Amino acid sequence: MPELPEVETVRRGLAPAMVGARVARVTLRRPNLRFPFPERFAERLEGTTVLELARRAKYLTAHLDSGESLILHLGMSGRFDVRLPDGSNLSPGDFYLEGALGTPKHDHVVMAFANGATVTYNDARRFGFMDLVATRDLETCRHFASMGVEPLSDALDAPRLARLFARKITPLKAALLDQRLIAGLGNIYVCEALHRSGLHPALPAGALAKPDGSPAPKAKTLVKEIKAVLTEAVAAGGSTLRDYARPDGERGAFQHGFRVYDRVGHACPTKGCTGRIGRIVQGGRSTFFCETCQVLPVR
């Protein structure tokens, strides 16, 4: 599933084609994706102009001049193909590039714009979805109401992290992946941020808060590294594993800078560390970390 940097990369690729453009026609080639389309979905989109294309965690939101916002979630394999007015093509979020995945038979939604551009949503697995909600109700809608703080926003700082994690015995990695606390973090970038911070993924999350609720020293370090990892990943166009490419069709490059993710047995890249990267399973997901410089304190 694409994480925050990949979704932000898709947003940046779609924005030039969509923002300021009027939706002329919407074609639905099936009645549903993961969920049924909203009532009168195509009718409510047609004739509207896209004022802004934003991102909330791992969701895209297109704010329309009708007072509604289109919410888009890519699921596991969602991608967009864009045909620009000049006839050129982009693939902002080109997932599953080989075989049947990503072929035209999985083109489920086609949006034609008055400027001649066409945006096609393709989703082989159909885990993605689209919804329409009143823009004024966006933050309280069912998709976002319980969502936590944005990790790249100024709202996430060491005191906020300490308040979120205070007295929690949940493993630190699980707490970071809890979208009700911090929205948008995924497995890859949590593993990377924890390694840079020198924190064991199984450390109780509450260890980042002092008894009085103020941040422990490592809380500031972790916040800094979360923001650094995400910022670097966005700049690199996301991470390509087997299914992701940048808006221009090129592969994302951040995977070349992975320190621990999917690097079991490799030497730890931390200067002076002689350890190797290990793997454990937490919550059904692989966790990668250095067995030497990310030590779980003995209690």
From Swiss-Prot:
The keyword Zinc applies. Belongs to the FPG family. The keyword Iron does not apply. The active site is at P2 (schiff-base intermediate with dna), E3 (proton donor), K58 (proton donor), R285 (proton donor). Keywords: DNA damage, DNA repair, DNA-binding, Glycosidase, Hydrolase, Lyase, Metal-binding, Multifunctional enzyme, Zinc, Zinc-finger. It comes from Methylorubrum extorquens (strain PA1). A zinc finger (FPG-type) spans 259-295. This is Formamidopyrimidine-DNA glycosylase. It catalyses: Hydrolysis of DNA containing ring-opened 7-methylguanine residues, releasing 2,6-diamino-4-hydroxy-5-(N-methyl)formamidopyrimidine; 2'-deoxyribonucleotide-(2'-deoxyribose 5'-phosphate)-2'-deoxyribonucleotide-DNA = a 3'-end 2'-deoxyribonucleotide-(2,3-dehydro-2,3-deoxyribose 5'-phosphate)-DNA + a 5'-end 5'-phospho-2'-deoxyribonucleoside-DNA + H(+). PANTHER family: FORMAMIDOPYRIMIDINE-DNA GLYCOSYLASE. The gene is mutM. DNA binds at H106, R125, K168. Its cofactor is Zn(2+). Monomer. GO terms for biological process: base-excision repair. Its EC number is 3.2.2.23, 4.2.99.18. One of its GO terms (molecular function) is zinc ion binding. Binds 1 zinc ion per subunit. Involved in base excision repair of DNA damaged by oxidation or by mutagenic agents. Acts as a DNA glycosylase that recognizes and removes damaged bases. Has a preference for oxidized purines, such as 7,8-dihydro-8-oxoguanine (8-oxoG). Has AP (apurinic/apyrimidinic) lyase activity and introduces nicks in the DNA strand. Cleaves the DNA backbone by beta-delta elimination to generate a single-strand break at the site of the removed base with both 3'- and 5'-phosphates.
